[in-house]
Regions:
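Membrane-interfacial terminal anchoring regions of lipid-handling membrane enzymes
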Residues: 1-848
């Protein structure tokens, strides 16, 4: 078997020998020499158990006329089957306290032979075997995927290594070491340990240093951090509590902790990052038209003095790879990324781990051991000043708007910082904008009520199969940083110190966490990139049939672009440099719009089945135009309105819009912005102003009025949602409906509204928007909840609801009034149907 394996290996493997070739140990030739020179034999030392590596070493030792590695090792009267010693075996299980058999049995026997025979010695020759070139020099992405790393390869990967890298394998014999000298040193300096402990540790460290020269340092947390996490005081205490709580042995509780660590930790490797670099470079150049990056200089400056936590918005699964790619290409360390455990799929999960991903469960409330392990691991990342990345929204946005923040990771980051401050922490909000989405059709289905599908390899392949090779550009814009220490000071929490993982967090720290979350989301929106697709979307979706005369469309695009350029939402906001005509050509190229030729002038229309999807890109930039849109809407609807009335209505609506769209302005800054935008619309002739300062709508059927109507439309669906919910609460009466029921019914009515009146907008299906609205109603004291959980309100609420006539037209108000009117019996049936549907979905998810 060995001979056959060796011959087969010789056909595909030609190792390159590095360094000097060792000489055979000198044998004693006279009786005098024999007394002073111990009899030595050679034993080759390999770090990991690998038959193929042993065969390669055997072949080279025979070729170089050295002692063959697979010949029997004979020392005195003792004989071993081969002259190879493996330091690590596949059956070792990485427990905190390895059992005795974790040491190589052959090493134990050889030590016993030397102790019984003082005249004998063994020369241990450490050998390094590497498959493939250095990751920095490899240009084949497939070979990089299987190039040698610090991780011990599986049998399958080793077979692939042999096939791919047989002609580019490397072997190096290192300086021989006396086993007897190692034993004597161990007995002298570590008398309480088995000599095997010292010898295995010393040789492992030695071979690690040799591999590091070629592969670079081992950055994998799976091998380097696991033990420190498990041995930490907090995790050991959690293991003890788990043992008591679960009535299991300490060993079993320890095994659970080890399982959690293996489930969570990153397995970073340079070859995986290089593989991702080559593969993603190909992706961005072939599938997309490249990646445009703005304001990266901010990050480069911060990296010198701060622990960086990247907090991007979450649009697509591609986000995980995109930001790391951008950072890597600009010479900074790739961040460790917190990824949902739904992505811990076979093969895909390992690739993500190799690029720095670590996995977190969606919920682990009530699991004290998992919580302790995860917090300790996060603390280890921050204490090493390793950059970190997570999505503050928790999941991918299905509507294109920012989702309300999930503060779990943020709170644990602050908690770790307060345990022990290494560097000060800075959050880097990052805007990611696409011009087409891989998951677009999936998002539309989910927002229209289809259950969310669990991630799977099959699902990923299914998505890839549907991909068209026209995706436009990807935009990455780094926003204004958020400094944690500044926010802690604002809430008088800068001197708080937390000693243990399970220490309670003072209210001031919780307030600082919430402030940080909102600041991050507001700064993501400040860094918005207004690209050609989002401009086309916000304009064409504002028309009744999603069509415009081409010349009018060009003028409308120019008007929006000029407004965004002359009155930018923020200094970090980026606006496309393309002209209106170029934007239309770009939309045609991406197959999002079509040109309908006509004798009286060509018409630009949204492509079939693209309207709902384009709401996503409209919503990406809605916050940048919502204030001028609201002004235009109020002026157009009322025909004439004083600046004072305009401001009063906007001040009433602003808290709801701010919470929904994470707008940057404080209430104290709002008046200046209203005046600025109103003046801009007057200067552009979209609205008029009389001698008393009243704002007047342009005359109907004029070009200016048509442009005003288009500008006024984007905000209307938010207003319709608000007043639909207000009408529902008013119709049920004070004390007759709970907040939860309002959220559920508003969501249901939104779906019905969309079907009956063709409101093609996914946000009518988004429960988070209704939850946000109810929350702000409570904060603004329009409603309150009684002891039975029912909503109560007074004349203040009724007066605010009556203000709808200043905002919406009569037809829309009647429609909303009609759709929110139903009997107690109808209400009961609707709630029961929703509860049944939710129970079925929960059961389906549980089975999956």
């Amino acid at each position: 078997y060995r001979r056959l394996s060796s011959k087969l290996l010789d056909l595909v493997v030609t190792p390159h020998v590095l360094g000097e070739v060792p000489t055979e140990p000198v044998s004693a030739t006279t009786e005098t020499e024999a007394k002073t020179e111990r009899q030595k034999v050679v034993c080759y030392v390999l770090q990991n158990h690998s038959r193929s590596n042993a065969l390669v070493v055997d072949g080279e030792t025979r070729r170089l006329n050295l002692k063959p590695a697979l010949d029997p090792l004979v020392i005195g009267t003792h004989q071993e089957k081969a002259s190879v010693l493996f330091l690590q075996h596949n059956d070792e299980n990485n427990l905190l306290n390895p059992p005795p058999h974790a040491f190589p049995p052959r090493l134990i026997k050889l030590i016993e032979v030397l102790q019984a025979n003082p005249e004998l010695d063994i020369e241990l020759v450490p050998v390094t075997v590497l498959w493939g070139r250095s990751p920095d020099k490899e240009d084949s992405w497939f070979k990089l995927l299987f190039s040698d790393t610090w991780a011990t390869p599986s049998t399958v990967k080793q077979l692939v290594n042999i096939g791919l890298h047989g002609r580019q394998s490397y072997l190096e014999f290192h300086e021989p070491q006396s086993l007897r000298d190692l034993v004597e040193y161990a007995q002298k300096h570590y008398p309480n340990l088995s000599p095997a402990t010292y010898i295995v540790s010393t040789l492992n460290d030695y071979l690690d240093r040799q591999r590091e020269v070629v592969l670079g340092p081992d950055l994998s947390d799976r091998r380097n951090v696991m033990q420190s996490v498990l041995k930490s005081r907090d995790v050991q205490e959690a293991i003890r509590r788990e043992s008591i709580r679960g009535k299991i042995s300490m060993l079993e509780a320890e095994r659970r902790a080890i399982g959690y660590v293996n489930e969570i930790v990153s397995d970073y490797s340079h070859s995986a990052v290089r593989f991702a670099d080559l593969a993603l470079t190909r992706l961005w150049t072939q599938l997309y038209d490249g990646v445009e990056v703005h304001n990266f200089s901010t990050v480069r400056e911060l990296a010198k003095d701060y622990e960086i936590v990247y907090t991007p918005c979450h649009r697509s699964h591609i986000d995980y790879l995109l930001l790391s790619y951008v950072i890597y290409k600009r010479g900074l360390m790739v961040p460790y990324i917190a990824a949902g455990d739904n992505l811990n799929l076979p093969f895909v999960g390992q690739l993500l781990r190799g690029g720095g991903a670590f996995f977190i469960r969606r919920s682990f409330r009530g699991n004290g051991l998992y919580t302790s392990v995860f917090k300790e691991y996060l603390y280890s990342i921050l204490s090493r000043n390793t950059p970190l990345e997570y999505f503050i929204e928790g999941g991918r946005s299905r509507t294109g708007r920012l989702l309300p923040p999930k503060t779990g990771m943020l709170a644990m980051t602050v908690h770790s910082h307060l345990r022990g401050r290494a560097k000060p922490i800075v959050f880097v909000p990052t805007y990611i904008g696409y011009e087409r989405l891989m998951e677009g059709s999936t998002y539309v289905g989910e927002m229209q009520g289809k259950p969310k599908e669990a991630e799977s390899i099959f699902g990923i392949l299914k998505t890839l199969r549907k991909i068209e090779r026209i995706f436009g550009k990807v935009h990455v814009n780094f926003g204004e940083p958020v400094f944690l220490d500044d926010l802690l000071k604002q809430h008088n929490a800068e001197n708080v110190y937390i000693e243990k993982n399970d220490d309670p967090v003072p209210p001031a720290v919780s307030e600082a966490v919430n402030s940080s979350a909102n600041a991050i989301l507001e700064n993501i929106n400040r860094a918005v990139v207004i690209n050609p697709v989002s401009l086309l979307s916000i304009i064409l979706l504002a028309t009744p049939k999603h069509t415009l005369d081409e010349e009018i469309c060009i003028k409308q695009l120019e008007a929006y672009r000029n407004l965004a350029s002359n009155f930018p939402y923020d200094q970090r906001t980026e606006v496309t440099p393309l002209s209106g005509k170029e934007i239309i050509a770009y939309g045609l190229k991406l197959k999002l719009i079509k040109r309908v030729q006509h004798a009286l002038g060509d018409i630009i229309a949204i492509e079939d089945n693209q309207a709902v999807l384009l709401t996503y890109f409209r919503n990406n930039i809605l916050h940048a135009f919502v204030l001028p849109s609201l002004i235009a809407s109020l002026v157009e609807h009322n025909g004439k309105i004083s600046r004072a009335d305009l401001s009063n209505v906007i001040y009433t609506l602003y808290p709801f819009l701010k919470a929904e769209l994470f707008l940057k302005w404080k209430s104290s800054e709002l008046k200046e912005q209203i005046e600025q935008y109103a003046d801009a619309l007057v200067q552009s002739n979209l609205i008029q102003q009389d001698d008393e300062g009243n704002l007047i709508s342009s005359a109907p059927n004029t070009e200016e009025h048509n442009q005003l109507v288009v500008l006024a439309t984007p905000v209307k669906q938010s207003l319709e949602r608000y007043y639909m919910t207000l009408a529902l609460i008013t119709q049920r009466g004070s004390g007759n409906i709970s907040a939860k029921q309002v959220e559920e019914l508003s969501h249901l009515l939104g779906q019905r509204l969309s079907v009956l009146y063709e409101f093609n907008s996914p946000e009518f299906f988004d429960k988070a928007l209704f939850q946000s609205f109810i929350k702000v109603l409570t904060q603004q004291n329009y409603i309150r909840t009684n002891d039975q959980g029912q909503i109560e309100f007074d004349d203040n609420f009724r007066q605010m609801a009556a203000g709808a006539q200043l905002v919406l037209d009569e037809v829309t108000l009647q429609m909303l009034q009609h759709i929110t009117t139903f009997t107690d019996e109808e209400l009961k049936e609707a709630l029961e149907a929703m509860a049944s549907q939710q129970a079925k979905r929960r059961l389906k998810r549980k089975k999956a």
